[in-house]
């Protein structure tokens, strides 16, 4: 029997020894952190455009609108929306002919 064959075929007891200690608090904590990391990564990839727009524009508070006429408020809202819409410039659109 070659050394390679012995390495490739671990005994059943060997696997049981490695897996039987899964009640260790460190293993449980690492598993929970790994699962949470995976979930957050998936959500980030699905909603990254929305999330980063909100962080860039949505959390900024504008000037107070107290005492400002409604027409000026609407104009300000429109300017803010246009600023958000223009931010799509770093995405590449490829059109095939």
Curated annotation (Swiss-Prot):
Q: Which residues carry this modification: Phosphoserine?
A: 64
Q: What is its main location?
A: virion
Region Disordered, as annotated, extends over: 61-80
Q: Which GO terms describe its cellular component?
A: host cell plasma membrane; membrane; virion membrane
**Positions of the record's site feature: Seems to be involved in pH gating:** 41
Q: How does it sit in the membrane?
A: Single-pass type III membrane protein
List, alphabetically, the Gene3D superfamilies matched: 6.10.250.1640
Q: Which domain of life is it from?
A: Viruses
Topological domain spans for side Intravirion: 44-97
Identify the keywords attached in UniProt to this record, alphabetized.
Disulfide bond, Host cell membrane, Host membrane, Host-virus interaction, Hydrogen ion transport, Inhibition of host autophagy by virus, Ion channel, Ion transport, Lipoprotein, Membrane, Palmitate, Phosphoprotein, Signal-anchor, Transmembrane, Transmembrane helix, Transport, Viral ion channel, Virion
Q: Which residues form the signal peptide?
A: none
Q: Name one GO biological process term.
A: symbiont-mediated suppression of host autophagy
One Pfam family it belongs to: Flu_M2
Summarizing activity control, the record says: The M2 protein from most influenza A strains is inhibited by amantadine and rimantadine, resulting in viral uncoating incapacity. Emergence of amantadine-resistant variants is usually rapid.
Pinpoint the site Essential for channel activity, possibly by being protonated during channel activation, and by forming the channel gate and the selective filter. 37
Family the UniProt entry places it in: Belongs to the influenza viruses matrix protein M2 family.
Subunit relationships: Homotetramer; composed of two disulfide-linked dimers held together by non-covalent interactions. May interact with matrix protein 1.
What is recorded about the domains? Answer: Cytoplasmic tail plays an important role in virion assembly and morphogenesis.
Additional detail: When the channel is activated, one or more imidazole moieties of His-37 probably become bi-protonated.
**What job does this protein perform?**
Forms a proton-selective ion channel that is necessary for the efficient release of the viral genome during virus entry. After attaching to the cell surface, the virion enters the cell by endocytosis. Acidification of the endosome triggers M2 ion channel activity.
Full protein name: Matrix protein 2
Species for this entry: Influenza A virus (strain A/Equine/Alaska/1/1991 H3N8)
Question: Taxonomically, what lineage is the organism?
Answer: Viruses, Riboviria, Orthornavirae, Negarnaviricota, Polyploviricotina
Protein's gene: M
